[in-house]
């Protein structure tokens, strides 16, 4: 499994909204500037996150985006799967119809263990966890 640029940027976008989570709407251009990411690229990502119900939008002068839940209610896994799709290390773990060799495959056990390890990390790590870990290591940093 390799996390794409889209996945990394989605995490950074959600972390930025989480860090600045006051209930107010944050313009996407502000996030783009803070994260040094193209606002056009973030528009594509925010659309997926909005469609999934992770963020709420408002138009107008005071418009922008905000989280629909608290940072401790979002896991890295659900964010990545929303923009990346499956996090399986090999395609045969995703298939609804496994390949002919699935039952006798010598490597499938390893791939399943890798999948479990990935899921164990991303499904048990929240935005809040990531922010807390970062701040513990960088106490003088206000924004990430």
Report the location of each language-model feature:
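A short alpha-helical element within helix-turn-helix/winged-helix DNA-binding domains
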Residues: 26-36
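Alpha-helical residues within the helix-turn-helix
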Residues: 33, 50-51
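Short, hydrophobic-biased segments on the C-terminal half of alpha helices
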Residues: 46-47
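Short amphipathic alpha-helical interface segments
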Residues: 10-22
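Beta-hairpin "wing" of winged helix-turn-helix
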Residues: 54-67
């Amino acid at each position: 499994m390799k996390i794409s640029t889209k996945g990394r940027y989605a995490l950074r976008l959600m972390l930025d909204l989480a860090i600045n989570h006051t209930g107010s709407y944050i313009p996407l251009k502000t996030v783009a500037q803070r994260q040094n990411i193209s606002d056009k690229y973030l528009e594509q990502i925010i659309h997926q996150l909005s469609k999934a119900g992770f963020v709420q939008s408002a138009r107008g002068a005071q418009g922008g985006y905000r989280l629909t839940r608290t940072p401790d209610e979002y896991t890295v896994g659900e964010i990545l799967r929303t923009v990346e799709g499956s996090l399986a290390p090999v395609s045969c773990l995703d298939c609804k119809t496994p390949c002919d060799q699935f039952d006798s495959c010598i490597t499938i056990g390893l791939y399943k263990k890798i999948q479990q390890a990935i899921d164990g990390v991303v499904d048990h790590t929240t935005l809040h966890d990531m922010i807390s870990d970062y701040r513990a290591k960088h106490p003088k940093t206000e924004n990430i």
